[in-house]
Structures are given as C-alpha cells and as structure tokens.
Amino acid sequence: MENIYLTLALSPLIGSLIVGLAGNRLGRTLSHTITILGVAVSTVLALYVFNHHVLEGGDVFNENLYTWMQIGSLNISVGFLVDNLTSVMLVIVSFVSLMVHIYTIGYMVDDDGYTKFFSYISLFTFAMFMLVMSNNFMQLFFGWEAVGLVSYLLIGFWHGKESAVEANLKAFLVNRVGDFGFLLGIALLLAF
C-alpha cells in the first residue's frame, strides 16, 4: 500500500514539475493532458484507498517514509497517516481537483499563462495531499505552508489587475496570522 500512497501523492507533483519546467515547449494540449493525467491517477488511487479503508475495513496506515532531520531527541520525518477520514478527504480533494483541471481548459483558453496556471493547480493538489496525509505536525505545517504559497500564486495570477494584487496581499496577511497560531500550537504541544 505504501507505493499506492506515494504514487497518489506524487502524481500531481510530477505533472506540475514537467509542465512548470517545459510547458511552453510542450504546448497547451500536452501540458493540460499531463497535469490532468496526474490528478486522474490520484483520483483512481484515492477511490482504491477509500474502498480499502472505508468499505473493506483495512488497517490504519501510519508509517514514516524517511527521517528528514534529527535535532537532539526531535526527529522530523516524512510519513503518511491514512485512515477512514483521510481516505474520504483524498477522494474529495482529488475529485474536486480533477474537475477544476478539466474546467480550466475552457476557462484559460485565451490566457498567455495557460501552462503556468495548470502547473500551479497541480502543485496545489500535491500540497493538499501532503496536508491531508501527514502523520506529524511538522509535515502538516509544511503542507499548510505549501497550500498557502500556491494559493498566493493562484490568487495573484493576474498580477496586472489591481484587484488581484489587493486580494493577493489580503490572503498573504490572513495566512500569516493563521501561521502564527499554528506554530504556537505546535510549540505548545512539543513543550508539554
């Protein structure tokens, strides 16, 4: 199952990186096909995970994939926690993201930033998966920050419009307030 969870989480990231780095050379059709394929793979796997955990009553998966950093007795690792709630959220996130990707084909048809936008929304999907599947507070925080960063990029995508710039600044400031509370909570949990 570990490979299924990894593939589910990494498929949108791979699509985002390919399109982000080579989208203009690939062209619009291939760019949106790559990102949609990555999210579609995640959606199919999310349905499989949902079936395994919720419908068949599979065991909770809580494993560290690797230790990222060790500071004294504090281990900062990357891992996944997949239970019934996570399985439901994976289906919701992947399905909604797939629908957004498909809708974006028509919505962005005349926009010069077509491939960049697809790269961003695919990256957003990966960030949401990392947030939903995290098995520790540090990874949860990094997932939260990644969602905030990509939200910032998407909200300010049309940076030539004054309203987009204002909304972007507002989202950035609101996220920083949330970050402070989040970090304070993590610090209190680690202290006690």
What are these regions (language model features)?
Residues 1-192:
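...captures the hydrophobic TM-helix bundle architecture rather than a specific catalytic motif
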